[in-house]
Curated annotation (Swiss-Prot):
Name listed for the protein in its UniProt record: tRNA hydroxylation protein P
Assigned protein family: Belongs to the peptidase U32 family.
EC number(s) on file: 3.4.-.-
Keyword DNA-binding recorded: no
One GO biological process term: tRNA processing
InterPro entries in alphabetical order: Peptidase_U32, RNA/ubiquinone_mod_enzymes
One GO molecular-function entry: peptidase activity
Length: 422
C-alpha cells in the first residue's frame, strides 16, 4: 500500500518551514496574483519561494507552485513570463485550474508535472479523462465530489492521482466559482482577491410589488444573519474510510492566509491521524479536540461521505467565526532561544508547549523559569519575563515586539498556548 501524501498550505516562507517541520510531506504556495491568493502571493518573492523549495528538497519533501487563477487576455503575456520564471525555481509540480494554462505550462515546462486545481470542478470520469489525456498527473477533486465517485475514477484511471481537501474553509459557491465579492467590492475571487462577503451578516427585506415599499424582516436578535456562511471542512473523523478506499493519493489542508499556529496544528493533527491509520491506532476524539483549539466557523464533514441533498448542516448562520478553545501566547523563534509574544503572557502561569514532529524537549529549572512534562504534555512556566535587551517584566502584551528569553532552547517553530474554554 502506497502511503498517502499530506499536503499543507504555505502562505509564506515561515509557514512553509513550519508545515514541513510539523510533518507535511509537501506544501503548496505561489507568487503573485496568478496564485489565486493575492495576499499570500505577495508574501512570497521569487527568491524566498526558491529558498522554500531548496529547504523542502533538503528534507526530501516537495513544493507545489500554484498558478491557478483564471487569466484574461490582457494577462496572457505576463502569465507566460510568470510560468517560465516559476519553472526556473524547479518546483515539484504546478497547480493549475484553466485548461488553456495547462497546455501553456506543458509547452513551456514539459518536465514539471501538472496538478489540476479544485477550481476546475472535476466531478466525474468524463472530465477526469479529458484532463488526464491533456497531460495532468493529479486532480485536486472538487469538494462536492463523493468518495464513491473518486473510487470509480481511480478504477478507470489507475495512473491518475486524486487529491482531496480534508480541512479548512469552504466556499459558499461551487468550488469557488463566486461573483458576490466582485459585485459588492469589485474584488474578483477567481483572480485571487475575494473579500469573503459570504462571511458577513445580512438583513432580510421583502418588497411589496404593488407600491415598491421595502420592509425589513427583523430576526430574533435583530442583528442580521450569516445566511451565506459555510462551516469549515473537517474530515479527521473519516481518515479510515478515505485511506481504506485506496483511491486517494493526497490529503490537502486549506489555509494559505491563516496563522502560523493553524499551519502547525492542522499539519500536526492530520500527520498523526495518517500515521495512526497505518499503525491501526486511530484516535478521532483526540483529533477533534485538538482541531477545536483553532478558530473555526463550526465544523462539517462536507460532501465526501454524504451528498448535499442529504444534509442541511453545512452552514453557520450565527457567526462568521468563533475563537478556538486555546489561546496562542507565544511563537518560538527559529533558533529556539526566544519567543515572540502573541497574547498577554505573565509569570507563574503554565503554558503548554506545542512542538514539531519528533522534537525533543528537555526539562530544566533555572532563574528564568522551568520546562517540565506532565501527563505526556510539556509546559513552560516563567519566573520572570526577561526580554532580549535584558529588560525585566512581570507581564508582556502582544503589542510588545521585543523577543522574550526562554529558560532553555525549545524546538524551532514551537508554540506556547493556554486553554481558555473547556
Amino acid at each position: 500500500m502506497n502511503q498517502v501524501e499530506l499536503l499543507s498550505p504555505a502562505g509564506n516562507l515561515k509557514k512553509l518551514k513550519i508545515a514541513l517541520n510539523y510533518g507535511a510531506d509537501a506544501v503548496y504556495g505561489g507568487v503573485s496574483h496568478f496564485s489565486l491568493r493575492n495576499r499570500a502571493g505577495k508574501e512570497f518573492t521569487l527568491e524566498t519561494f526558491k529558498e522554500g523549495i531548496d529547504y523542502a528538497h533538503a528534507l526530501n519533501k516537495k513544493v507545489y507552485a500554484t498558478i491557478n487563477g483564471f487569466p484574461f487576455n490582457s494577462q496572457l503575456k505576463l502569465l507566460e513570463e510568470h510560468i517560465d520564471k516559476m519553472a526556473e525555481l524547479e518546483p515539484d509540480a504546478f497547480i493549475i485550474a484553466a485548461p488553456g494554462v495547462v497546455k501553456l505550462a506543458l509547452k513551456i515546462a514539459p518536465h514539471i508535472p501538472i496538478h489540476l486545481s479544485t477550481q476546475a470542478n472535476v466531478l466525474n470520469l468524463l472530465d477526469a479523462q479529458v484532463f488526464y489525456d491533456l497531460g495532468v498527473k493529479r486532480i485536486v477533486c472538487a469538494r462536492e465530489l463523493s468518495l464513491n465517485d473518486a473510487i470509480e475514477i481511480k478504477k478507470a484511471l489507475p495512473n491518475l492521482e486524486l487529491e482531496i481537501f480534508v480541512h479548512g474553509s469552504m466556499c459558499f459557491a461551487f468550488s469557488g466559482r463566486c461573483l458576490i465579492s466582485a459585485l459588492q467590492k469589485g474584488r474578483v475571487p477567481n483572480r485571487g482577491s475575494c473579500a469573503n462577503d459570504c462571511r458577513f451578516d445580512y438583513e432580510y427585506y421583502v418588497k411589496n410589488p404593488d407600491n415598491g415599499v421595502m420592509m425589513r424582516l427583523v430576526e430574533e436578535e435583530g442583528v442580521g444573519t450569516h445566511i451565506f456562511n459555510a462551516k469549515d471542512l473537517n474530515l479527521s473523523g473519516h481518515i479510515a474510510e478515505i485511506l481504506s478506499s485506496n483511491a486517494i493519493s493526497a490529503l490537502k489542508i486549506e489555509g494559505r492566509t491563516k496563522s502560523s499556529y493553524y499551519a502547525a496544528q492542522t499539519t500536526r493533527i492530520y500527520r498523526l491521524a495518517v500515521d495512526d491509520f497505518y499503525h491501526n491506532t486511530l484516535k478521532p476524539s483526540f483529533y477533534a479536540s485538538e482541531l477545536n483549539t483553532l478558530k473555526n466557523r463550526g465544523f462539517t464533514d462536507g460532501y465526501l461521505m454524504r451528498r448535499p441533498f442529504e444534509r442541511l448542516d453545512t452552514q453557520n448562520h450565527q457567526t462568521a467565526i468563533s475563537e478556538g478553545d486555546f489561546q496562542v501566547n507565544g511563537e518560538i523563534t527559529e533558533d529556539g532561544r526566544f519567543f515572540a509574544c502573541k497574547f498577554t503572557t505573565t509569570t507563574n502561569t503554565a503554558y503548554e508547549i506545542i512542538a514539531p514532529k519528533n522534537a525533543a524537549i528537555t526539562p530544566i529549572v533555572n532563574e528564568i523559569g522551568k520546562i517540565y512534562t506532565f501527563e505526556k504534555r510539556s509546559y513552560l512556566v516563567l519566573y520572570k519575563i526577561l526580554l532580549e535587551n535584558n529588560t525585566e517584566l512581570e507581564t508582556i502584551h502582544s503589542g510588545n515586539v521585543n523577543l522574550v528569553r526562554l529558560p532553555a532552547p525549545l524546538p524551532a517553530f514551537s508554540f506556547l498556548r493556554t486553554q481558555v474554554r473547556v
